[in-house]
Amino acid sequence: MAKDMTSGKPLKLIWNFTIPLLIGNLFQQLYNMADTFIVGRTIGVQALAAVGSTGSIVFLIIGFATGLTAGLAIPLAQRFGAKDYKGVKHSFYVSILISIATAIVLTALSMIFCRKILEIMQTPSEIIDGAYDYLIVIFGGIFSSMAYNLLSNIFRSIGDAKTPLYFLVMACVMNIVLDILFIAVFGMGVEGAGYATVLSQIFSAVACVVYIWKKIPVLRLTKADLVATKQNIREHCRISFPMAFQASIIAIGTIMVQIALNQLGPTSVAAHTAAQKIDQLAILPMMSFGVTMATYSAQNYGAKKYDRIWLGVRECIKLSLTFAIVVGIILNLFSPILIRAFVGEGHEDVVELGRLFFLTNGTTYSFLSLLFIYRYTLQGVGKTFTPTLAGIMELIMRSVAAVVLSNMYGFVGATVANPMAWFGSMVPLMIAYYIFKNKVQHGVEQ
């Protein structure tokens, strides 16, 4: 159900929007964790390392697609906030066209070059074949991933965070069942995990399309709505492609870290894989608050209600920082138990490395919390330059950790890549936000 975020108490709106978004993101991570958990417990640590070593490459390609679809939803959210419902439909159609064209290119390039990328990353010979098999399946399903991400972002742009949640929960259950069936019963190995993910995404995308057609008139396209002017296409590309490249720039930094981990051996790769899966789950509250601010700021920017944006940012910072501190403490206390859940007993070397990961990462979640809020708020008002610059800062910081610190301090040196990247990205985003706010308040920019 569509929700107007340009009126009402900002704190209540932000909280009510974030909760289903957070639950949805939790299930999205369960999607990913199911593959990792079932692979690690049924096939073994070697297979776990194979799937884990693909994470940064998947982030590079799928992250580009996800960033693009999130950017495509911003002009639509601004038009929805301005009550321009004809413009909403035109925006939706243009977003579909850009997504289809991008999916074709990404599928072709990723399937052609994924083996070469694995070799460039110095993926250990013991796991490279398994990693390649998994990637081919995942990249073959880029269309389904992009379709679901576009439609779920479009739902959120009109203030509906609940509908994509319902479909995602069903898809997550389907993914886990298929994981068990394909891996444990049919013995399909890491490829089975990939097929389970792709089929579940297809289900989610189809469910979203059916729901839009039956329940959401503002998104139901007729022949008259199939209008794609050059100006409209340029506007969507101006916002969406910088966000897509920003995601890929960040992903290149994670690839640099993965190369460093690969050189440290399968034990380090397995420890980082398990720890990062937990980490991705832990940061979801902070990320969800940030994503909420993209929709909230976009709608209010379209409605020219700027004071509501500033108030929303202040309220969101309070909530997000609280979660960051609490989650960081919990992970530092219980990380050994959580790591063992992935690798089982008898791998204490992996568990110890996982503990070190959270010692460096869990204590710095406050940086990430602020980063998400400032980044998504700026993106919501159409300011994409600084978030892209911040992505470059993340790349630089991660590269320094991978090339220099990992050689000096081993696994610990590689784990400080995230805190360094978060801080390096947060600073320019914070400065840009307050410059933008000052310009708007003084009438320099509207």
Predicted regions and their residues:
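Transmembrane helical elements of multi-pass membrane transporters/channels
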Residues: N16-D35, V137, Y148, A171, ...
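Hydrophobic transmembrane alpha-helices of multi-pass small-molecule transporters
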Residues: L60-G63, N175-D179, A205-V209, L281-L284, ...
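Short runs within selected transmembrane alpha-helices of multi-pass transporters and secretion channels
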Residues: T69, V137-R156, P164-C172, A193-C208, ...
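Short alpha-helical transmembrane segments in multi-pass integral membrane proteins
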Residues: M1-T18, L76-G141, V185-F241, S297-T364, ...
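Small-residue-rich hydrophobic transmembrane alpha-helices
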Residues: L48-A108, S145-P164, H272-S335, L368-A390
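N-terminal transmembrane alpha-helices
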Residues: M5-T42, S56-G71, P75, I100-T107, ...
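Residue-level hotspots within pore-lining transmembrane alpha-helices
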Residues: F27, Y31, I61, A65, ...
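Helix-terminus/linker motif at the lipid-water interface of multi-pass membrane proteins
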Residues: L26, L30-L48, L118-S125, L181-M188, ...
